[in-house]
Structure formats: C-alpha cells, structure tokens
C-alpha cells in the first residue's frame, strides 16, 4: 500500500502535467487560428494534386503512344452501322396459359371467370369505388 506522501507526490505530478497540457492545447489552438481557413488550404492542396497528376499523364510515354495510335486510325469505319433504324423489338401478346389473369391487352387466358383489372364487384356487393 502506498502511503500519503507518495499519493500526494503522484497527484502533484498529475496536476503539473495537466497544467502543461492545457498550455500546449492553448498554443496549438492559437497556431490553428492564425493559419488560413481550412477550405482555402484544401483547395490549394487539391489544385497541386491535380496539377501533378496532369503533368504525370502528359509526360507518360504510354500516353504519347496512345495518341499516335489514335492519329493513325483509318478514315473508314471498320464497324458497319445497322441499316434498319427505328424498328423495336417484336413482342407478341401474352400467351402463357395462366388461368388467374384475363386482361384483353395481354391476351386472353381462355378462362371465363378470370380476374380483370380494374376490378368489377359482382352483383350484390357494396360499391366501394
């Protein structure tokens, strides 16, 4: 067990460390407050990064090879354009024998009691719509 003198010594060390940290925090905050706003510094850093990347891309020998290859392309198109334009897909009517549907625009299922939409209430039902 620690005696009172040892505890007092440790507490005083912690107190002095805390005071020095408080002074350090104030100094850091003053330093940060005197600098440029964060947005401006971020913009300058981003501009420098963009400039460096464009310089690397422009100086790359592979980029020059690509530009030369693109410059020597044949003037004729190698891929033929389709001759028929504006013709969509030829989709037939719904013909799967599903006896749970019966809309005319989808094709009839052949079931005379099939459900249709909008739903028509049978005779005797209250009119909800």
Swiss-Prot record:
Keyword Coiled coil found: yes
InterPro entries in the record: Caulimo_virion-assoc (IPR004986)
Domain of life: Viruses
GO cellular component: host cell plasmodesma; virion component
Subcellular location: Virion; Host cell junction, Host plasmodesma
Outcome (variant: residue 128 to A): Partial loss of capsid binding
Coiled-coil blocks: 1-31, 38-59
UniProt KW keywords: Coiled coil, Disulfide bond, Host cell junction, Virion
Coarse class of the protein's main subcellular location: virion
Keyword GTP-binding: no
GO MF, one annotated term: DNA binding
Segments of this protein annotated with the region Capsid binding: 122-129
Family the entry assigns: Belongs to the caulimovirus ORF III family.
Quaternary assembly: Homotetramer, through coiled-coil domain. Homotrimer when bound on icosehadral capsid. Interacts with capsid protein, and with movement protein.
Official protein name in the record: Virion-associated protein
Native source species: Cauliflower mosaic virus (strain Strasbourg) (CaMV)
Lineage: Viruses, Riboviria, Pararnavirae, Artverviricota, Revtraviricetes
